[in-house]
């Protein structure tokens, strides 16, 4: 029997990586020119304010305040999933699905990735995907694959949609609304560019995920996961062999219908229907959550998941004490994920405190003024990759960059639409791999995949996507 190769794994935890990055930003703030102020207002691009020790130390703590809404959502999501798991419906449902797909499990991958990507391109699904990491981890492990496959389905699926945002209000919408008054933008061109970026990125992602999934399914020893990660994966998601007579009870079927309905309503709640002139959902759920479907955010979703957890508990005849204990235990399981999400926000907090974001974007704009036309899109893309590591929020980056880069593109005779989509695409690319994105770090923690392992596997995928993006964006910049 051939000896299994020892898998290399970067041992640094997610917390350590994020904290080291925050300290690095603090050091960088002292190496750049000092900022100039006029009447307590910074002269844009003049420099940065060196971070004080207490500002560096406090930034991860202040990240909690910045992430309180998503943290509460993730905590309640954990309680909801624990209630579902306690009924046995999800585990049995997965077993039934795998049994029916016997030999065709790989067909799930492109279908699921397309669904996630559709949510990404329409409303920027990212933090909302956290619960799916655990769900798909169980499914893919049962199907003979590993949690790299399940993580890639969620992250590259939703991420390809975010990268190629078409009508996403948190990316395209935020960027267009941040442009100075009078800047002309053709929404049709933006949707066209976004669609091409979305589908091309999705195709590349599906190819790499399918290739790896086939290899692991054929030979489990070919997994990129370290032995430690494999042990954690098996302990959390590994189950006994599926019984031949496995089937769902009537109560379990109802539970799974309610489970699917919960996520479906959440997705409908996040899609900005009013942006498309659709008023059908106006008034829906307003009496329950305070906001109609289409105007939801994390607070409304958290309330919805809490309500559905209670309903599922009642359907399954759970006693009050058992329900509360189960829900609290599930929420407790998410504490590590919540800490990672919150601490990751600390990098953005320190960026604002030191004006490092302001310095980078204004000096980047100066650099782009002298760039030849065919290099404008590639340089703009690279600049926004750097910015996105520091400001992973698509709406935050749009508010920072679009008012400066958009008009500059127009003045130089370049397409404003292609410039906006360059910003969006660069941010989407970085959010496939950056440690400053709490959703990535939290999702990988749930899947028992270490960040170093994800970077090792996804690096080639991200590089391929970046090259394709640059070629397409350069063509669009020259055409429009």
Regions found by a protein language model. Give the residues of each.
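Membrane-interfacial loop-to-helix junctions in multi-pass transporters
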Residues: 53, 65-71, 99-111, 143-149, ...
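Core transmembrane alpha-helical segments of multi-pass membrane transporters/permeases
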Residues: 11-23, 43-91, 291-359
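Interfacial/capping segments of alpha-helical transmembrane domains
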Residues: 27-54, 274-286, 354-363
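Alpha-helical transmembrane segments and, especially, the helix-loop junctions at the ends
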Residues: 117-133, 137, 143-193, 204-209, ...
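Hydrophobic core segments of alpha-helical transmembrane domains in multi-pass membrane transport
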Residues: 15-31, 74-82, 115-119, 157, ...
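Long, contiguous bundles of hydrophobic transmembrane helices that form the permeation core
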Residues: 2-15, 39-42, 191-326, 446, ...
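Hydrophobic alpha-helical transmembrane segments of multi-pass integral membrane proteins
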Residues: 75, 103-135, 341-354, 367-407, ...
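Alpha-helical transmembrane segments and their helix-start/interface "positive-inside/aromatic belt" motifs
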Residues: 5-22, 141-155, 246-259, 326-337, ...
